[in-house]
Amino acid sequence: MKLDQAARALFLTELVSGFFLAMRYFFKPKATINYPFEKNPISPRFRGEHALRRYPNGEERCIACKLCEAICPAQAITIEAGPRRNDGTRRTTRYDIDMVKCIYCGFCQEACPVDAIVEGPNFEFATETREELYYDKEKLLANGDRWEREIARAIAADAPYR
């Protein structure tokens, strides 16, 4: 046994086998991508930046039921409902999400009965200050308008599994 170990140490077999292993992978195609110039496709269930959606007629979907606020484990959502309208519905006067607190669990999206709050496909929303990560209703509606096509496509792709 000791003679075998001495021969391996003398001829550096581990070093040579490691070198050949490295050379084998050196000439294979690379598994990485050139981010940010190339991006991997994301899943329809990806949970990124939050957005509030609108109906096709332009009216916001949120009915101020506050289910998302109640289910949020991080207590990152704050909603204030306005008075009831003539048709009996309500809308929010304030809808804030503190993205610093948010844990991107997706419970708010699952709890919403009208698919108003969604987590969109955008994952590149780094900021320089914490205040920029405090999203108000206007910012959330702007996100929804910007990403509506991708959000609708992701919801349609995920529909058989809901």
Swiss-Prot record:
Residues reported to bind [4Fe-4S] cluster 1: 62, 65, 68, 112
Swiss-Prot/TrEMBL catalytic activity: a quinone + NADH + 5 H(+)(in) = a quinol + NAD(+) + 4 H(+)(out)
Binding site for [4Fe-4S] cluster 2: 72, 102, 105, 108
Pfam family, one: Fer4_7
Keywords: 4Fe-4S, Cell inner membrane, Cell membrane, Iron, Iron-sulfur, Membrane, Metal-binding, NAD, Quinone, Repeat, Translocase, Ubiquinone
Assigned EC number: 7.1.1.-
GO terms of biological process kind: aerobic respiration
Domain 4Fe-4S ferredoxin-type: 52-82, 93-122
Similarity section: Belongs to the complex I 23 kDa subunit family.
The name this protein goes by in its record: NADH-quinone oxidoreductase subunit I
Natural source organism: Azorhizobium caulinodans (strain ATCC 43989 / DSM 5975 / JCM 20966 / LMG 6465 / NBRC 14845 / NCIMB 13405 / ORS 571)
Name of encoding gene: nuoI
